[in-house]
Swiss-Prot record:
GO terms for biological process: translation. Belongs to the universal ribosomal protein uL29 family. The gene is rpmC. The keyword Signal does not apply. It holds the Pfam family Ribosomal_L29. One of its GO terms (molecular function) is structural constituent of ribosome. One of its GO terms (cellular component) is ribosome. This is Large ribosomal subunit protein uL29. Keywords: Ribonucleoprotein, Ribosomal protein. InterPro entries: Ribosomal_uL29 (IPR001854), Ribosomal_uL29_sf (IPR036049). It comes from Borreliella burgdorferi (strain ZS7) (Borrelia burgdorferi).
Length: 66
């Protein structure tokens, strides 16, 4: 599933990153305690968080324009 974060504003990206971090933490707990129906979802979420971190850093450094 391809995510398109390029159209997000900086505030939207930070909010989405926080949401994904919470979802990732929940999936980690579920995988330790019990069964997760889609174990690859953790990898997808982790990579989306990394993409958002990269884009936020680019905005802060001035590489990417708002």
């Amino acid at each position: 599933m391809l995510k398109n974060f390029k159209n997000f504003t900086l505030e939207d990206m930070k909010a989405k990153r926080l949401e994904l971090k919470k979802e990732y933490l929940d999936l980690r707990f579920k995988s330790v305690v019990g069964h997760v129906e889609n174990p690859l979802k953790k990898r997808e979420i982790r990579r989306d968080i990394a993409r958002l971190n990269t884009m936020i850093c680019e905005y802060e450094l001035g590489i990417r324009k708002v």
